[in-house]
Amino acid sequence: MPNMKPLLEDAKRRVDRRLSASRQSISSSRIFSSAFPDRLKDDHDAQVDYTAPPRGAGSRDGQLPYMHQSIFSMIAAVGSKSDFHARFDESSDSEGEAEGQTQKQPGKASLSNKKKFPLSPTLKPQSTLEGRGRRHRRSISDNKLLRSLKPSPKSSKGTETTVQTEPPTSDEMSPLASPRRARSATPRAAPILSRMLEAEALLDKKQSADQPSSSTKGETDGTSEQSCASPLSLRLKEMFGFEMPEKVLMEYACSLLQNILLQGYMYVTEGHICFYAYLPRKSAVTIRSGYLHKRGRKNPKYNRYWFSLKGDVLSYYTDPSSLYFPSGHVDLRYGISASLTEQKDKDKEVRDFQVTTDQRTYYFRADSSASAKEWVKALQKVIFRAHNEGDSVKISFPIESIIDIEESPITDLAETFKIRVVESDESYAIDEYYFSFFESGRDAYNFVKGLISEGPMKTSQLLPPPSEQTSPATRARGPRNRWSLNSDLSQSRGNGIFKTQRKRSASTGQTNSGPDGIGMSPRQRDLSDSFVNSFEQATDASAVLQSMIDTTESASQILNRSDVFQSPTIHTLRQRHPSGDRTGRRLSDGTARSTHPNAADANRNGQEMQYASSDSDQGTQHPSKVNSSAPTLNELVKAGAYPLQRAAGFAEYLRSRSRQMSNLLASESMGYIEKVSGMWAGGRRHYGETEGVLPDDQDVDPEDKEDGVKHGDRFRAHFALPSTERLQATYYAYLHRVLPLYGKIYISQKKLCFRSLIPGTRTKLILPLKDIENVEKEKGFRFGYQGLVIIIRGHEELFFEFNTADARDDCAVTVHQSLESMRFLVESGLLAEQEKDEIESAQAEHRMLQEARLDGAGEHDSHASVNESSELHPIFDDPRASIINFKPSESLRITCLTIGSRGDVQPYIALCKGLLAEGHKPKIATHAEFEPWVRQHGIDFAPVDGDPAELMRICVENGMFTYSFLKEASTKFRGWIDDLLSSAWASCQDSDLLIESPSAMAGIHIAEALRIPYFRAFTMPWSRTRAYPHAFAVPENKMGGAYNYITYVMFDTVFWKAIAGQVNRWRKKQLGLKATTLDKMQPNKVPFLYNYSPSVVAPPLDYPDWIRITGYWFLSEGGNWTPPTDLLDFIHRARSDGKKIVYIGFGSIVVSDPSALTRTVVESVLKADVRCILSKGWSDRLGDPASAKVEIPLPPEIFQIQAAPHDWLFSQIDAAAHHGGAGTTGASLRAGVPTIVKPFFGDQFFFGTRVEDLGVGICMKKLNVSVFSRALWEATHSERMIVKARELGAQIRSENGVDTAIQAIYRDLEYAKTLARQRSIVSSTPFSPTPSAKTTAEQEEDDVDDSEEWTFVGDDTEIDVSRRLRDRAVSDADMLPEPVTSAS
């Protein structure tokens, strides 16, 4: 990683920002680096709103609520008191997945973070900067190539399979080793086999020291040989570590056959058979997701969860919409195998499968046999990639080691043969390699068989001399299947490559873990033995692991676990002494014993120096590092600050004064009290690049002097994160869901995490920073607490509470800084610089090999005809079905029904133009005044009654679809609604598909009567979700998911109650349908198309599949518009003067004093020193008659226009200020300019909030000179806002909303047809236009209980359970089955 500025300066800068952080009224999302000019400070009119409506009309703010307010004002005032979907991620005790429930069996080597593993001084220090976790480090370059591990002095050269490691560097030879090595730091280095790593490193060091002359001679000989070797021979020598170039005899394109099919090349040289496959790294995307049943650790009951396989982690959730709150995870970096469970009944389909890791076996059950097989295949691929996390796979074995070759006919598509290779001099293990050839398989078989017959392997070469005793440190092997990955060899051998744990690549050396093959005896062992069995016996390594028990439990460890108090607080580390009688002992059960005296001494010294790694978050001082200075007054005050700390402080005083007392007191037990009190006291911490606590944060918790590296390791272990994830800051806070939950916030480079610390809770939060839109500071829910709101893409807000405003502000600033540092970094597309270097080096190696192959094509026959693939193909997988073309074979007559203003009709024109291009026959049914506009685009038209001007008057006076709006419409304008329904029915005849704006109210009933598929489309959120409030019920402050969801329920209920009487009469009279209810209609099951950008309103996680956010349906008309000359001159003059240009236009709004609003706009423009293009549309039609109506003259800085296409105009300006309508907002955001929104009614408040949450603009609550001028200046000068708006504009312009909507229509058409048939069967009568075939008696029976006739099977969270129980009691139990719901 690139170096940051000095940590001290960074910390001071952070403190300064912390002190200056806001308790201001504006959102902290707009932290602006530059101060506002003095002229933009608040003036006397700072609290005045010149857009206030006429007196008596009501206003959003206090006495004058805006017109759109309704019953939701009461909801907003009361707030959210309940959470409909409480998602405490608790599970039964039998699940046992919490960190604190790791079993401690005496004979079992647990790999929890409470164990420490000693490292030899000869090993490279495994610091967190170098322990890469998921991706091991590679060094493939011209000056640091792969080298083979030298054999023991007495072994036969050339009779062993190549083992590749990196030569130890100067750092690796350092006598200092890292005192900490948590599992998460180097997950690929199997902790249980770390001793083997030491043995091989010690051997390599010793041999390098003993044989310098021979090494030099070999290099000289190799140089002379290279002069006459081919480029391919030289390249293979470098890649596979041969001692000298070997002539390439033959080359074939083939595939290595195991549980996966890996395509690559086989190279047959004079002395070796090599296999190479290029395996590019895949991006972190979700590989597979879906529902599975999981069995608990102790409870045999299966519970249903939503599973997601992403990267190396299999996570599961109680609710698929809560993807940031996992119930648990399986870290596949430690996976051993994934396989179907064997059934006693062979005829029965297997739905169960299991995943074995180094700690336990997980049992799962899929819904079908096919699903189980697909999951197993996906898991096998991930385990393979996790264990071979490189960019290439290499295998090399000497021809002399080949025992035999035989054909293995597996499939008719390819010829397959098996090569059996003896392992080495030290063991009689036999490796088996399967190679499949799609071409030239017979030639390859005959050629290799000829080589074997010419030089059969001598038996004497396999047997060591009788007097020779091979050191166990010389070789550590598994049963078979060696995998060499770039610079670090990764081995995976056993009964299939997934049946045993393989070697995992660390930053140096290698580890190997064969369960039954380390030092294989001649007697073949049962290959079905599981790797887990090797943990059952108390081997030396397991004894060391068991002895390294952590005694530095932290506060979070204490509160999170109760078994901490059940173990001794003081443990003696058992010392291992070298023993001569162990020198020749064979290694078994997957444990390597180091017998080298130096290694034993190093291990012993390392043990004396080390702590044990714990699963905690805060540590204590080492007993040997007691502060001996006299206690200061501050220390005494701190000791008495908290009740629990008084005893701890007194004990520390005695411990530092008396050696005898120090021996008598259980120091660690007192540490428990200190840490619990410290944890409840809260606080915060910042960490540097090495994850050490920054100096300015040491005072937060003085008794914690631990090395900060441990914090990062525990953080990564808690959340199964890679070692590249660096911890930056931690905070103690409350997470508010249903109840406040105390825990710890972790902020790293790419994640914001939370872990509960309350006993009995297991809530975890893993939130990628790229999904955070904004952070806002609010007052806490409880008195004396400070609130912080995290706004997430497509998810409800998260609320945190802090004890102090200082900690809250610091957390907000830290999150903002993290967001800025990676705002435009896409996780799946951009990698770290180190990862880029590794990928480039692997690609360079692959490219050079290809070039060498081409250069040497004349020296040998090349049969490489199979295209290379980076995919890991499953064996015998069903061929992937081709993409189904959902487009109907015949042209459809499609009617689009909408009412409202021009902005409501324009998106449908764009959609219909796309449908015309697809060969369909679209028609728009709307108000008659839009007919010329619609027909000029070649679209058919049908009139719908209702004056849009009258409709706008109702909206302006009462608010859009508020209770007063519906009340007036149903009383004074009852005839208007009747005419609307009747005219809509007539306009929709002769249609095959109906697409309607739900504001038209009639479409769902018309489609039911005509039995045609029905879609909805709208410009604002209308479907129930917890992520956003209803567009007509946006609160002043964030209210949370419960409030958001209830706004939709309340709106649907109120909206339907207001029109239900008229609609049902219309249904019976004209449509011939029975009366209906909201439950029978089930509008939330209707396919929905939202015509706004997913970049602006991200799809909520709880949206079902039939709701799609397609992107804006723009109608570009600017190409045919010629701008006036004076407008072009105005723009040119502004650019020449170096002035910013803004557009101001609030549409046809109604204000009490239009002159005052005009004067405010003029003064704000002059005060902000910008140029303005003004579209003045406000009027005083409903204004105060006493208000002045004198026209305000416009200065030269303002140019007034009547109309201009948004797509042309917004491309000429630097910022736009408007009312926040859906279409206007989309146009300004597409242009990539900062947007200022002053909402008035309807959905304008929603889009104004979205603009501010995205950081691309400002939403003004009031409009006056002070506020507006400052907003204009910030929108034109804030580089942060300008860049964000530019990036968002690029995203929107890259979308094709119309095309996406058409494809969504095709895909959901069959689903919509199914809904239409179900509805018509339930509600049709003999008088229906399309009557059903039911008899009169059947119709009468349906009249009683038709509400459950077609209840959906699945997660029906929208329908209340009590209602279903009530309806079920009324229904005839003998006729109707009970409604089925999901188990989840």
UniProtKB/Swiss-Prot annotation:
Keywords: Autophagy, Cytoplasm, Glycosyltransferase, Lipid biosynthesis, Lipid metabolism, Membrane, Protein transport, Repeat, Steroid biosynthesis, Steroid metabolism, Sterol biosynthesis, Sterol metabolism, Transferase, Transport. Residues 285-384 form the PH domain. The keyword Transferase applies. Residues 21-36, 146-156, 174-189 have a biased composition (Low complexity). Residues 1-64, 86-189, 204-229, 457-526, 560-629, 1322-1350 are annotated as: Disordered. It catalyses: a sterol + UDP-alpha-D-glucose = a sterol 3-beta-D-glucoside + UDP + H(+); ergosterol + UDP-alpha-D-glucose = ergosteryl 3-beta-D-glucoside + UDP + H(+). Disruption phenotype: Leads to white colonies with decreased conidiation and aerial hyphae formation. Impairs autophagy by the accumulation of the intermediate of autophagosome. Its main location: cytoplasm. GO terms for molecular function: sterol 3-beta-glucosyltransferase activity. Its EC number is 2.4.1.-, 2.4.1.173. UDP-alpha-D-glucose binds at S901, R902, D904, A1204, H1206, H1219, G1223, T1224, D1243, Q1244. Residues 158-172, 209-229, 458-473, 483-494, 560-572, 604-629, 1322-1336 have a biased composition (Polar residues). InterPro entries: ATG26_PH_GRAM1, ATG26_PH_GRAM2, EryCIII-like_C, Glycosyltransferase_28, GlycoTrans_28_N, GRAM, PH-like_dom_sf, PH_domain. GO terms for cellular component: phagophore assembly site membrane. It is an enzyme of class 2 (transferase). Residues 1338-1350 have a biased composition (Acidic residues). Belongs to the glycosyltransferase 28 family. The GRAM and PH domains are required for the localization of ATG26 to the preautophagosomal structure (PAS) and are involved in autophagy. Sterol glycosyltransferase responsible for the glycosylation of ergosterol to form ergosterol-glucoside. Involved in cytoplasm to vacuole transport (Cvt), pexophagy or nonselective autophagy. This is Sterol 3-beta-glucosyltransferase. It comes from Aspergillus oryzae (strain ATCC 42149 / RIB 40) (Yellow koji mold).
